[in-house]
């Protein structure tokens, strides 16, 4: 029962999986993590703008069914650059996106995570930074972000161990100079306009198919390399939800993305917009005085994000959406050459157990 006295479905714990042949973690491994009911998936061979065909989606369903996982959440159906820039060709790519939504609905998908970040997806300067306990983690060094963006892109691509990463497609990164030129005239105001155009075009289909579009926060939450960022703080989240005020226009609220800026109070945003959060990412970051930050374990005291306050805010509002541990350290045998940066097995599994332990205790304190 939520605070309105309504009967709801319980929060569903998810685990991001990159697919057979593209993820060193198996579905059998994930099945052994208590509490996981949902595989957060995507067709990682698809380029932005392409239609996800029914036959391709059915193949993923076939892989998940023996393990009893649902495929309710897709992360991500990436948005083509022509839509973000607002080129005349965008309507064709929007039509493809609409067809993909319709095809996904045939398989019970409920949430599509996406982002509207120009050129780059998440951005880090070190993928295997020593934490101090023998593990490594994703790290952002503020002084290096002003260097050549191509150098940073090459570093990331060269350390993906041949694995895919949405937003870092080699085909796109090979045209980095062209992409920067494409986005050069796009102001923050224009990017907001183009996002609104995209959402207004797809909302009728989302309602028809009962699929929520859940935008991911910009990571990190500030402009980089002269490129504008939109979802960066509480004010911009408010603006986004009013921009297209529709129950199918929702958030993927990523605690670590927002709290890379220590001024952002994620728990307050959760409390204010719980009904518009379709998907929750729980990530912990440690801040440094020079503007650097490191990703940390999910344990509250290991970072500065306020994980306990955030989980309590979700619990207090009767959160009924999907949640997953977002990023983790690389532990024990994991390291360069054998793990997708930020997406090892062990620390994310530990994070799930921490999150569920907190949730169980909150339930117990409420007498559930």
Predicted segments — roles?
Residues 40, 73-74, 228:
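Generic secondary-structure boundary/loop-capping signal
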Residues 5-14, 19-21, 28, 62-65, ...:
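Histidine-acidic metal/acid-base catalytic patches
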Residues 19, 43-44, 77, 117, ...:
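Residue-level "edge-of-site" marker
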Residues 45-193, 207-208, 257, 315:
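Structural motif corresponding to the early beta-alpha repeats
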Residues 37, 72, 277-278:
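A short, local hydrophobic-aromatic micro-motif
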Residues 9-49, 56, 63-68:
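Ligand-binding pocket scaffold of soluble enzyme catalytic domains
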